Swiss-Prot record:
The keyword Ribosomal protein applies. It comes from Sulfurihydrogenibium sp. (strain YO3AOP1). This is Large ribosomal subunit protein bL21. SUPFAM superfamilies: L21p-like (SSF141091). InterPro entries: bL21-like (IPR028909), bL21-like_sf (IPR036164), Ribosomal_bL21 (IPR001787), Ribosomal_bL21_CS (IPR018258). One of its GO terms (molecular function) is rRNA binding. Belongs to the bacterial ribosomal protein bL21 family.
């Protein structure tokens, strides 16, 4: 059994017991969140178009740093900037 979950403008395949890195959620560590499921595939192969996924927030963290480099030739113009995108690690508990 699995579900396709949409959160933060992206879609993820959620299965019970699986850890997912999603865009940062406004929930504290240890809290339970409900995410809307776009479609749910049951064990018998049946496909449902609605459902919910209950998940627990494990931790909040940031991804590895990416570097953004701007450069203009012949003008001695260079800029280096770094960015770390925040994410939330959740554990899927059940699909309803």
């Amino acid at each position: 059994m699995y579900a396709i979950v949409k959160t933060g403008g992206k879609q993820y395949k959620a299965e019970p017991g699986r850890l997912l890195k999603v865009e940062k959620l406004c929930a504290n560590e240890g809290e339970t969140v409900e995410l809307p499921a776009i479609c749910v595939r049951l064990d018998n192969g049946e496909l449902k178009t609605e459902g919910k996924v209950k998940a627990t927030v494990v931790k909040h963290d940031k991804h590895k740093k990416i570097l953004v480099f701007k450069y203009k030739r012949k003008k001695n113009y260079k800029r280096l900037k770094g960015h770390r995108q925040p994410y939330t690690l959740i554990k899927v508990e059940e699909i309803v």
